[in-house]
Design a protein with these regions (language model features):
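Bacterial N-terminal signal peptides that target proteins for export
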Residues: 1-7
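Predominantly soluble domains enriched in secretory-pathway, periplasmic, or organellar proteins
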Residues: 13-367
């Protein structure tokens, strides 16, 4: 195995009193050298973390057990039109810029959105046979287990413009993709590797959809419209929008509680985490965590919600009962985060610094 991981333990920690809450994060490793890590997700079996490096145009697979690299997968580059989010105008770029991801087959398949490709890709971690008559993206894969490098492919599925968050339904029938610049959501047949419908959200209101959450029965998709300030509800049986619920001015990331009643929302510009009751359609709780609140995640026992403030460089832990911040830590430019299924690790990406921080979640009984 190649062991060339560069890591550091240089990080500032700000502890709030533990008191009755009893949660604490222990920093255990830092990975450096990522090209603008946008997102991190943990495989359903908890075995590995998948890191999406937007500007690096690659993704990393890292063991959650050994904290060693498993694979680095580099896309072959082709020119494409990108988007300058500060100047609000098109720019010259490349198609293969990974944004977000999800899984099927208990982590065997990784579903990845490509920012400038108007497409998503599916990578088979088991490197199974190529499926004929489909589109593909090319990858150079370095395997850190075998020490070998090889040319591989990932199935390419057209969507609409600027796909971002992608979620596979629990029954693995569909992948639901939010298309930022098309005001639409693509519904992809997971087995056929084909987009079967593009659903417009917001009518003529020019919504910007980003966050996606799926009900546990795979019957509904909730879409956070970052421009629009609403949650669009899609019926996954009829494949149509059945509701459009005003929630907060700038909803970015959403997570659904296990009882399907509470939707946790990050309000990006206003820097808040919000608890929203889907039955009464009312905001029940909110807490300010710092400007530009990005990704959020629930602990498996739903006692805590983890969140980051990108501009203020804060990682916070919020008690879901009191909705108080019970722990905070300084992290430079945090963007993505994910919790392992056993509730023992938290992974956080630092976008501008090109780092991924790994924490042990301590002081809290595991689910």
């Amino acid at each position: 195995m190649i062991k060339t991981i560069v890591w550091s333990f240089i990080i500032l920690v700000v502890l709030l009193p533990l008191g009755a809450e009893g949660v604490e994060l222990k920093h255990i490793k830092t990975f450096q050298g990522a090209g603008a890590p946008k997102a991190v997700e943990i495989s359903p079996d908890g075995g590995y973390a998948a890191v999406m490096n937007l500007e690096g145009m690659d993704f990393w697979l890292i063991s959650t057990v050994t904290l060693e690299f498993i694979k680095k997968c580099q896309f072959a580059r082709t020119p494409a039109e990108g988007w300058d989010y500060k100047a609000h105008q098109p720019i010259k770029s490349y198609a293969q810029k990974p944004v977000e991801c999800d899984f099927s087959g208990n982590g065997r398949f990784i579903w990845i959105s490509l920012h400038n490709a108007e497409a998503i890709v599916v990578y088979d971690t088991a490197e199974g046979p190529v499926v004929p008559n489909l589109l593909y993206e090319r990858l150079k894969v370095t395997d850190y287990i075998t020490g070998n490098s090889s040319e591989q492919t990932a199935i390419k599925i057209p969507t609409e413009k600027t796909p971002k968050v992608i979620k596979v339904t629990p029954d693995e029938r569909y992948a639901v993709v939010a298309n930022w610049h098309s005001s639409s959501v693509s519904i992809v047949d997971v087995q056929a590797y084909k987009t079967i419908k593009n659903i417009r959200v917001g009518g003529n209101n020019q919504y910007i959809p980003r966050g996606v959450a799926i009900s546990t029965d795979s019957q509904k998709a909730y879409i956070a419209n970052q421009r629009g300030g609403t949650i669009s509800v899609i019926d996954l049986t009829t494949l149509g929008v059945i509701d459009d619920i005003p929630v907060t001015p700038n909803p970015r990331h959403i997570v659904l509680s296990k009882d399907q009643r509470t939707l946790y929302i990050s309000d990006n510009i206003n820097g808040k985490i919000i608890a929203f009751d889907l039955i009464t359609k009312t905001k029940t709780k909110e807490v300010f965590i710092g400007k530009y609140a990005r990704t959020i995640a629930l602990s498996p026992n739903e006692k805590y919600v983890f969140g980051v403030s990108h501009d203020e460089g804060k990682l916070v832990v919020v008690d879901t009962t009191s909705f108080n911040i019970v722990y905070k830590e300084d992290v430079p430019y945090p963007m993505g985060l994910a919790v392992t299924p056993d509730g023992r690790q938290l992974w956080v990406t630092s976008y501008q610094m090109g780092m991924i921080y790994v924490y042990e979640i301590a002081g809290e009984p595991q689910p």
